[in-house]
Amino acid sequence: MSKLQAHNEAIINAPISNVWAIITDINLLDKVNPGVIKVTGRMDKQGETRTCEMDNRGKRGTMTEKLVELVHEKKTVWAIENDTMGMAKMLKDPRFCFCLEKLGDNKTKIINESYYEPANLMVRIMNVLMMKKKMGEIQGQILSNIKNIAEK
């Protein structure tokens, strides 16, 4: 796997099964990920793909990702297969992961990690100056959205 670039975690006051249901439900992705407008595909079976219509601060496009690892109530790992927004050109071997840990009957730790290698020198500079920070902010928002849905 590529280098870890961003890591965030949260404690959610909900059973691990509820949190798992949220992160594997295709119908909730637009409520979880702030850039997703619409999504098709599957998020609950290893090897399946999802295609997301995205709006990244006014730049619209699509991203197709493959679920390359799925461990029930433990872990999901997504890899970008192709996109129209340029991420695949900027990042080598991007992976986006969720890891869950049961802390109690009604308490779950969720970790969101982004792995990738900058594709060239310019992207390496951008990564240090802004991309890693922005990735971390997006992860924080995603975890907050999951927490809000799970704790309702």
What is each residue range found by the language model?
Residues 9-13, 53, 66, 99:
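Generic structural detector for well-ordered beta-strands
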Residues 14, 56-58, 84, 116-120:
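Beta-strand elements of well-folded, non-transmembrane domains
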Residues 1-45:
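Hydrophobic ligand-binding cavity/cleft-lining segments
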Residues 111, 116-152:
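A conserved amphipathic terminal alpha-helix motif
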Residues 6, 37, 48-50, 63-64, ...:
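Residue-level marker for the onset of beta-strands and adjacent loop->beta junctions
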Residues 18-23, 29, 50, 67, ...:
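Hydrophobic pocket/interface hotspot
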